[in-house]
Amino acid sequence: MINLADLCLVGLVLAYSLNLAPMMFESFTSDRIWASNPPDSFHMFLGQYGQKTAHYWRVVSPLAAMTFILSFIFNWHLVDRMFWLFAALALYVAVQLATIAYFVPEQEGLIASAPWLSRDVLQARAQRWILLNHFRNVAGLLAYGFLMCALLARSQAL
């Protein structure tokens, strides 16, 4: 029979997957497109029908944070899981902070300043964004791996 600690952890893996999968999808599809030929490639974000994903992230990111909290509350007494949960949380927070502090503002800034910046500057900054995004993706995948380790760890209490 599944207990509440296990159920919270399964919910966390699901909620985290709703964060990780689109992040990876964007990295391999739309991110490569918008960074391919700035400023022309920025058109995918412009206009009435431009791509806007903020509404998705405003729902999914808090859901993952909430399930992290619930998982900590209900798994606190399970020593074999806590290390993995802390490691996953640290990477999740690092990815979220990097996204908030650099990735979103830089992308929005590039699009907004496209009329004033040279193609070379736009291209260099877009390529730097893509390069740094690889590290963000690795951190996201590692966090997922740590969550799977927590899920597979024994449910042995302190």
Model-derived regions, located:
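Hydrophobic residues within the alpha-helical transmembrane core of Major Facilitator Superfamily
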Residues: S17, I69, V93, G145-M148
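Interfacial segments of alpha-helical transmembrane regions
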Residues: I2-S17, I73-A94
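Juxtamembrane boundary at the C-terminal end of a transmembrane helix
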Residues: A150-L158
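Core segments of transmembrane alpha-helices
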Residues: V60-S71, N137-G145
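Interfacial loop at the N-terminal end of multi-pass membrane proteins
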Residues: A5-A64, P105-Q127
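Mid-bilayer segments of alpha-helical transmembrane spans in multi-pass integral membrane proteins
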Residues: V93-A101
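Internal alpha-helical transmembrane segments of multi-pass membrane proteins, especially GPCRs
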Residues: H55, F86, Q127, H134-N137
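Structural signal for membrane-spanning alpha-helices in multi-pass inner-membrane proteins
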Residues: M23-E26, F68-N75, T99, L147-L151
